[in-house]
């Protein structure tokens, strides 16, 4: 029996507890951890973030398993075409035009880029397990699997995902940049929640998330390039068109989704229902 299964008697309460754990793990002293491995001021934060988020991902995976969500009935990994708009959004986050034109460049060695790629995967794994594999199904369990309920579950889980990025203020991030990050993190969270709902592929969501982070943060972290050079007019126009297309595509997909498929993400098995009936809380 899963040790934390009893928490699913109150899905919103369970979601709140998991969210508090996620916030706490987000606040781990990544830079200090990184200094245990290297004195390089450029590499230490990357190494620390990679280690802390990898450990956090394992912790969240443990919670996911113990809540009976990791082995919940999954929809077949199909209709991968539904992930194509998300993949385009993720790839477009890289400053391709600026890199080709030479107005932006990656100046770090290949080893640093490889470490940064691992960091992006670790961050994505932690956040996808926490917000898509745990919080989102718990909210589906609470609200239901109808169109309006699915919409509410996507919005609430993604809003919590976006608000978590407010913690960056404590590490010295600018208010404007943090507000922008909260906004686009909410939108990315909505997109990934719908992808997860439709495909049932947690690994796919992790990959999309990692590609998005890698493309968007590689130059600012390990390269050089002015903001206006990276976000030049062609890039802004392409991004705007892709954003509108993705919003319309995933909103239609969400509202037209099969309720049975949504239910498979949060439905308790017969064994789990029997176990819950024996638990008195």
Residue ranges and their predicted role:
Residues 130-139, 172, 208, 215-216:
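Active-site-flanking alpha-helical
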Residues 47-53, 210-281:
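C-terminal membrane module of polytopic membrane proteins
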Residues 13-17, 83, 87, 151-156, ...:
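Hydrophobic alpha-helical transmembrane segments
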Residues 21-29, 90-99, 158-167, 210-221:
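Aromatic-anchored segments of alpha-helical transmembrane domains
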Residues 1-8:
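Short, Lys/Arg-rich, polar N-terminal cytosolic tail immediately upstream
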Residues 11-65, 78-100, 110, 114-119, ...:
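Alpha-helical transmembrane segments in multi-pass membrane proteins
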Residues 177-235:
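Functionally important transmembrane alpha-helices
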Residues 129-156, 194-201:
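Membrane-interface helix/loop boundary segments of multi-pass membrane proteins
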């Amino acid at each position: 029996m899963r040790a934390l299964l009893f928490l699913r008697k109150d899905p919103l309460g369970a979601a709140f507890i998991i969210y508090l754990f996620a916030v706490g793990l987000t606040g781990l002293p990544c830079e200090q951890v990184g200094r245990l491995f290297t004195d390089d001021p450029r590499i230490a934060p990357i190494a620390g973030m990679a280690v802390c988020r990898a450990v956090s991902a394992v912790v969240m995976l443990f919670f996911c398993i113990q809540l009976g969500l990791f082995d919940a009935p999954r929809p077949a990994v199909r209709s991968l075409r539904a992930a194509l708009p998300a993949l385009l959004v993720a790839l477009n986050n890289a400053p391709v035009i600026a890199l080709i034109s030479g107005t932006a460049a990656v100046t770090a060695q290949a080893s640093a880029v490889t470490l940064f790629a691992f960091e992006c995967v670790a961050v994505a794994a932690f956040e996808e397990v926490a917000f898509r594999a745990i919080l989102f199904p718990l909210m589906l369990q609470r609200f239901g699997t109808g169109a309006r309920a699915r919409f509410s579950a996507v919005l609430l889980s993604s809003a919590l995902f976006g608000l978590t990025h407010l913690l960056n203020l404590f590490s010295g991030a600018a208010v404007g940049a943090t507000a922008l990050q909260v906004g686009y993190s909410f939108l990315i969270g909505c997109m990934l929640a719908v992808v997860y709902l439709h495909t049932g592929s947690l690994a796919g969501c992790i990959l999309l998330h990692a590609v998005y982070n890698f493309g968007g943060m590689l130059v600012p972290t390990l390269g050089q390039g002015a903001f206006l050079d990276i976000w030049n007019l062609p890039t802004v126009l392409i991004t705007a068109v892709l954003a509108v297309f993705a919003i319309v595509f995933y909103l239609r997909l969400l509202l037209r989704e099969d309720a049975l498929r949504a239910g498979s993400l949060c439905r308790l098995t017969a064994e789990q229902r029997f176990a819950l009936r024996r638990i008195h809380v």
